[in-house]
Amino acid sequence: HQHHPVRPRPDWVMLVIVLATTAAGLALQYILRQPFCAWMGIPPENSLANQFFYFAIGTGLLFLGYFMDYTILGRHIRLLYALWLAVGLFLAFSPWRVEYNGRLFYTAQWIWFFPVLFAGVLYSQRGRGAEGVRNCLLSLLGMWFLAYITPYMSALGILTVVCCGMLVMAVRRGAFGRCTRGRLVLAVSPLLALLGYFLFLLYAVPHVRERLALVFHPQADASVAGYQGSAIQYIMFGIPFAGSGTIDGAQWIKLDGAGDWMLLSVKYLWGWTAVFLLLAAVLLLLAWGFRIARRQNGLLARSVCM
């Protein structure tokens, strides 16, 4: 039969939201990096070079996405899957690989493209019943392998949840035939396996139990192993550190304020109002994205949007 390309129509509101929030994020990082850059003796703009580079690439891919024929994902999924895995292995084992904090940096970035690839897997396996659901789950093995060798276990967990969510939605909407309890259980089986593994770690590894306890009660830590939780409580609520160690949470957060501690830095500098405004922008981005996904009728379009 004749092939009909599937290309999305631009959602200009979403484009404006994405570009505005990204630009605001870059400006926020520039402001928050100044204490760290002053401490290191480097210009703030130099530390943002990588961020601007990724911003340019992301913006280009965003607009390029409106000219792409997404049925390619379904028609050539085996080739695309093999290329994705080959590039990931090259980034992991090539002489030019970059390691940062014990993690393969470029491989860690590459892994996050997998959900788009998984949308193509869903599309290619539609109508195949339980066999199609099984094949979709088998495609997760490549992502798990790359995440394991990177190592990037948080990405493994997050992407597994995302892909299983996409698969469950496809099963419930009848993409693999009649929705049955067996197919739903099969679709969520990786999540059940992750839960079982986590419970096993809680039982078998005392260190895991200790670290989890510090999340809920960091002040009970006398060896300062839970310094992050203590710093969070200090910055957010002014609760002093009660262990035997010492930590200048405010100064430490200020020096690392443009990374994982951005929200804490915003609270420390500008108060709760700024925190709620920042969260509102992120929630607006997520809400509009899910709104676009819910408006799609086809499996491929809905999966790519998700």
Predicted regions and their residues:
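A structural signal for hydrophobic alpha-helical transmembrane segments in multi-pass membrane proteins
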Residues: 1-95, 139-140, 306
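Membrane-interfacial helix-loop-helix modules of multi-pass inner-membrane proteins that assemble, modify
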Residues: 36-40, 87-107, 205-216, 248-250
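Transmembrane alpha-helical segments and their membrane-water interfaces
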Residues: 44-76, 110-128, 165-176, 287
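Hydrophobic alpha-helical transmembrane segments
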Residues: 53-61, 266-289
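Membrane-interface segments at transmembrane-helix junctions in multi-pass inner-membrane proteins
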Residues: 93-127, 148-156, 220-222
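Hydrophobic alpha-helical segments of polytopic membrane proteins
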Residues: 130-149, 153-201
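Loop-to-helix entry and N-terminal half of a specific, functionally important transmembrane alpha helix
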Residues: 292-306
